[in-house]
Structure formats: structure tokens, C-alpha cells
Design a protein with these regions (language model features):
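Membrane-lumen/periplasm interface segments of multi-pass, membrane-embedded glycan/lipid transferases
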Residues: 40-81, 86, 271, 275-354
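Hydrophobic/aromatic-rich transmembrane helices and adjacent perimembrane loops
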Residues: 390-423, 438
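Perimembrane helix-loop-helix junctions
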Residues: 199-271, 276
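Membrane-embedded, lumen/periplasm-facing catalytic core of multi-pass transferases
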Residues: 471-553
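Signature aromatic-anchored transmembrane alpha helix within multi-pass, membrane-resident enzymes
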Residues: 241, 416-484
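Transmembrane-helix signature of polytopic, membrane-embedded enzymes
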Residues: 105-139, 158-159
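Transmembrane-helix motifs of polytopic, lipid-linked glycan transferases
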Residues: 92-120, 163-167, 350-358
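Membrane-interface transmembrane helices that cradle and orient dolichyl/undecaprenyl
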Residues: 156, 161-180, 190, 215-218
């Protein structure tokens, strides 16, 4: 038996290693076309503070414009320091971070599916976990996370929000206060990363209420009047850790009221610290909205409901927003894409039917089952609601809700994989005598081989698990070409216009001659400035490329004719550019200094 168990563990470790490598390779492949070759907008603005402040001043500024995100700022400072002048590395950094998140999702999905420790279900559990991670990586919602330096903000917030969900799920599964405290820690960090996740606070009270109801149910089930009916020979000797109910229906936490009270107060304490620190640093308790807007001034119930329904549509594969936010709308998508999205709905519907049928056949709806389903549903709903109250809806905010929906499917599979018998949930401090003979009975049934492994699936459930897993894989197979199609239209998203322009600007200047031959040795001149580049860009654009963070005097200047060039400007110390098309530049230095004809320029 020990040899068999060791072999199974070896296979489990091997399959896990293969899955992690596959996720890494898939993440690098799916994002191979995305690059950051220069900083602009909020990316450059944030870097400008890094360029002139130390770690503590950057992380804990005395005054902000309405946001207070010390944890994100600390990680962002470390990112700037780590990458240094290698601006091209930002996109790869974002990709690797997203891969790391997919690893967390992979393990979370395996935990939810409850299959990887079952010999007959290990392959299903590994496959579903891998599929969930891949669906996360290939989602077109990842555009901002990969193609912008501030994608770190969204990725970090998504990761911490999912870890909060994981901690609460483990707590509701009876893994004790440690899981709850881990969830509180992640919640503390996530609200100091992105303010909108304060909306997750009610989930803690849902978890505590569910655990209370579960323990109260156990108290009634294993009351003394019922335990007295158990044969004395099957009762173990009493121990100091044994906790019994005094009367049927009594409070299971009579000996741990202080712990329960602390669990209720801890989320409130975290919120008090959050709002108090905002009052001190930002000058107001209520977080600001998108682009510095005041939520209380811009909020519209009709608009918020519209954004909420739009996010639900996004989760189900329908790009209901404008193309400048999602790349291509559902109405403008190809017919075959619309057909595949319809097939994905069919897969989801069949999975839901299987899940409901499995729960119904179980015959009992426990507080734990209700609470855990509400945990996922409320998590998705709260994430949707918190991102629907501002002035616009961007797909980057849908990413966390979509990922939670994928994990919810893994949870459904895990519930189907459980046997038809409802396993008694053990409270954190409850050790009843009645649970022992029941567990002994379970062991004897398992040993007899009538129903498979101890924690395995009943034979009558194997077909349902297989069917659900195949439907999940079918959903992934159907959505893969859809996501690829959406990714092909990334260039229509609003921030890609400016990113392509600054990438082209870097290509024509510092990347063309090398930083050592450019910084401090050349000046850049741009005709007309139709792209309306600001003076801030002109001053700071090349500083991130300089290890000293100064740019060594190289800046951008705007001219309307060659006559505006300085008298000492030559082709050796100057690069003259002109906007080309709608999102790029071309080098016209030779034409400006009379070394080539203007007619030789390519047409826009």
C-alpha cells in the first residue's frame, strides 16, 4: 500500500510540474505579439515619481490626488528598480506575472475540483486545473495587464482578490481560523492596491454566518440525546480536545465566543484603517472614480445597471461594449465567432444542469453548500458592482469576475465528484463521539471495495464527472478561437493607439542607434506635433532609458519647419521625425538636412 501511495504521489508531482511548464510556455506564446518599448501616459507619470523619490516617499506620499495604494506603489517601485533602463522588459515582466497568477488559479482549481488526490480522478483534476489556467491566460481581458506598465496594478489586485476568495472558501470548508486570517490579510493588501475591492467585505460575514450555521447543524445532529444511542463500544475515550453540546441546538461556539467576535470585528477594523488612512493622506474617505472623477457626482443608477449587464455579457463571451474598450464588438464580429459563442452557452447550460441534478439527487441542502455557492456568486456580483459605478467600463475590470466564474465551474465539478452521501462537516473545535462510528463505517465500506476509494467517486458518479469534464473542455475548445479572434483586434483598443506611437518613437530614435550613442549626444525634433504630445512627454520620455534616470539632456522638441532648428543642429547630433499615418513616426533627418529628397518618403 505504501509503495502504491508513493507511486501515486510521484505521478502527481510529475503531472503538476508538466502543467506548470505548459502554462509558462502557453503564456509566453499567447502574448508574444505584445510589447512595451516606451512609456507613456500613466506609466510615464508614475515613473516620473520613481525617478526623483526614494522607496518610502514613493510608497507613502504625503499627498495624493485621491488614491492611496501603498502596497501597489511598493511593488511598483521594486518593479521599476528591478527592470531599470531595460524598458523592453516590462511586457515580459507582465507576462511572467500573469503566468504566476495562472499557476495560483491552477492550484485553486485543483483544490475546488477535489479530484487530484483520487486515483481515478487525478487526471481529470489535473486537466481541469490546467484548462482553467489556460483559459485565464488566453482571455482577451488581459490586454491592459500585459501591454501597460500599470497592468501590474490590475494583476496584483486580481491575484489578491482571488487569494481572499480562496481563504474564505477554505475557512468555510472547516480549515479553521488560519484560513480566515489569510483571507483577511489578502483583503487588507488588496484594498491598499485597488480601492474598489472594499466591496468584498460582506463576503467575510457570509463566511462567518455559514460556518456558524454549519456548526449549529452539527450540534443538533450530534446532540447528547442522539449520541446516547451509539453503542458504548464504538465510543473513543474522552480527551481534552473533545467538545460536546450541552443541549440540542445550543451554540457550538459557547467556548469560543471571543474568537467568533474577533472574526466579526476584524473586517471592520481593516475597513476603519483603510478609510482613516485615506482621510489623512488623500483628504477624503470615499475613493475617487476613473480619471479622478468623484463617484458621488458621476454616479447614475441606470448607467451602473447597464454596465453591470454589460459585464455579465462579457463573462459569457459577448463583447457588449464599444470597440475602443474591447477591440471588436459582438455585432461586428464574424458569424462563425457568434456561432461559437452560442455553442459555449450550450456547454455552460449542460454543465449547470449536471450540477443541479447532482445536488438535487443528494437529497440534502446543507448550510455549507448554500454558503459556498453564495460565496462564488456574491464574489462575482460584488466585483461587477464595484466596477460599474464609475464613468466607463473597461475590460480589464471584467478579468477578475471572469476568472472567478471559471473557478466556480471547477467548484461545481468538485461537488459532483463527491459521493451521494453528504459528508458531515466538522466544526473547528467540534469532536463528537457520533462522528467516530460514522467514519469507521465509511472506512469499512471503502475497504470492502463496494464504492471505490475512501475519498473517491461512486461508480454512478464517474460518468457525471467525465461528462462535466468533457463539457468543460469543450467550452475551452470553443472559446479558444474566439479569444484569438478578439486578440487580433487589440489595436482598436484606445490605449494601443498611443502605445504604438511611443513604441514607434523609440524605434526611430534610441533603439535605432543604441542608448550609448543617443543619450546626451542627440536631440529629437518632431514636425507639427499632430499627435499633441505634451511638454511632459518631451522632458521625461527618454529618462526611463537612462540608468541615471536623467536622460542626460536628450529631450524632444517640436518644430513646424527646418528654419526652427537650432543653428548647431546637424545630422550627427539630431534626429528629425514626422508623424506617419495615425500611429507612428518616420525619420526625416536626411530630408531635413538636404541629404535625400522628400519624394523618397513612404506614403502614409
Amino acid at each position: 500500500m505504501a509503495h502504491i501511495r508513493k507511486t501515486q504521489n510521484s505521478k502527481h508531482v510529475l503531472m503538476t510540474g508538466v502543467a506548470l511548464v505548459l502554462l509558462l510556455l502557453f503564456g509566453l506564446f499567447i502574448n508574444r505579439h505584445l510589447s512595451i518599448r516606451a512609456l507613456y501616459g500613466d506609466d510615464l507619470y508614475l515613473w516620473s515619481f520613481y525617478g526623483c523619490e526614494d522607496f518610502w516617499s514613493f510608497t507613502f506620499p504625503k499627498v495624493t490626488k485621491g488614491n492611496f495604494r501603498p502596497f501597489y506603489w511598493a511593488v511598483s517601485y521594486l518593479e521599476f528598480w528591478l527592470i531599470g533602463p531595460h524598458v523592453h522588459w516590462y511586457a515580459r515582466f507582465n507576462v511572467l506575472l500573469n503566468v504566476a497568477i495562472s499557476w495560483v488559479i491552477y492550484f485553486f482549481s485543483r483544490r475546488l475540483s477535489r479530484l487530484t488526490r483520487v486515483p481515478h480522478g487525478m487526471l481529470f483534476g489535473q486537466a481541469v486545473g490546467l484548462l482553467t489556467g489556460m483559459l485565464y491566460l488566453q482571455s482577451h481581458f488581459a490586454a491592459y495587464q500585459i501591454a501597460q506598465v500599470l497592468g501590474l496594478l490590475e494583476s496584483l489586485a486580481l491575484l489578491l482578490a482571488l487569494l481572499t476568495l480562496w481563504g474564505l472558501f477554505d475557512y468555510m470548508e472547516g480549515r479553521g481560523t488560519r484560513a480566515y486570517l489569510c483571507a483577511c490579510l489578502c483583503f487588507f493588501l488588496v484594498i491598499f492596491t485597488h480601492e474598489r475591492f472594499i466591496a468584498l467585505a460582506p463576503l467575510f460575514y457570509l463566511a462567518v454566518l455559514t460556518q456558524y450555521q454549519t456548526e449549529r447543524r452539527l450540534c443538533r445532529r450530534f446532540a447528547p440525546s442522539r449520541m446516547s444511542e451509539v453503542p458504548r463500544t464504538s465510543q473513543p475515550p474522552a480527551s481534552a480536545s473533545t467538545t460536546e453540546c450541552d443541549t440540542p441546538g445550543s451554540d457550538m461556539l459557547s467556548g469560543n465566543r471571543l474568537g467568533r467576535l474577533l472574526e466579526l470585528l476584524l473586517p471592520l477594523l481593516i475597513l476603519a484603517v483603510f478609510f482613516g488612512s485615506r482621510m489623512v493622506v488623500a483628504g477624503e474617505a470615499i475613493p475617487v472614480g476613473t480619471a479622478g472623477t468623484k463617484v458621488q457626482d458621476t454616479f447614475s443608477l441606470a448607467q451602473a445597471l447597464g454596465f453591470a449587464f454589460t459585464q455579465v455579457a462579457y463573462i459569457f463571451g459577448v463583447n457588449a461594449g464599444h470597440a475602443i474598450f474591447c477591440g471588436v464588438s459582438f455585432a461586428d464580429s464574424a458569424r462563425w465567432v457568434q456561432a461559437l459563442i452560442g455553442l459555449s452557452w450550450l456547454s455552460l447550460l449542460l454543465m449547470l444542469v449536471l450540477y443541479v441534478r447532482s445536488v438535487w439527487k443528494r437529497g440534502r441542502i446543507t448550510p455549507r453548500l448554500i454558503g459556498e455557492n453564495l460565496l462564488f456568486i456574491c464574489f462575482i456580483a460584488l466585483c461587477i458592482g464595484s466596477s460599474s459605478i464609475t464613468i466607463r467600463l473597461e475590460t480589464r475590470w471584467v478579468y477578475v469576475s471572469y476568472t472567478a466564474a471559471l473557478l466556480y465551474l471547477s467548484y461545481m465539478l468538485g461537488e459532483i465528484a463527491k459521493s451521494g452521501r453528504v459528508k458531515p462537516e466538522a466544526g473547528r473545535t467540534v469532536r463528537t463521539r457520533a462522528a467516530v462510528p460514522q467514519r469507521t463505517s465509511m472506512d469499512s465500506v471503502s475497504a470492502s471495495g463496494e464504492h471505490g476509494e475512501r475519498f473517491g467517486m461512486k461508480k454512478c458518479r464517474t460518468a457525471m464527472v467525465l461528462t462535466f469534464s468533457l463539457l468543460f473542455m469543450a467550452y475551452g475548445a470553443v472559446m479558444t478561437p474566439v479569444e484569438h479572434y478578439d486578440r487580433q483586434h487589440y489595436t482598436n483598443i484606445f490605449f494601443f493607439f498611443d502605445q504604438d506611437r511611443v513604441n514607434s518613437l523609440a524605434d526611430c530614435t534610441i533603439d535605432a542607434v543604441g542608448a550609448e550613442n543617443f543619450l546626451g549626444k542627440k536631440q529629437v525634433y518632431i514636425y507639427y506635433n499632430y499627435y499633441e504630445m505634451s511638454d511632459f512627454y518631451a522632458e521625461y520620455f527618454y529618462k526611463p532609458f537612462d540608468p541615471e534616470k536623467t536622460g542626460q539632456g536628450t529631450e524632444i522638441h517640436f518644430i513646424n519647419s527646418p528654419d526652427e532648428l537650432p543653428a548647431d543642429a546637424t545630422v550627427e547630433n539630431s534626429i528629425v521625425l514626422m508623424e506617419h499615418g495615425n500611429r507612428g513616426y518616420i525619420d526625416v533627418s536626411a530630408q531635413t538636412f538636404g541629404l535625400a529628397a522628400w519624394e523618397e518618403l513612404p506614403q502614409a
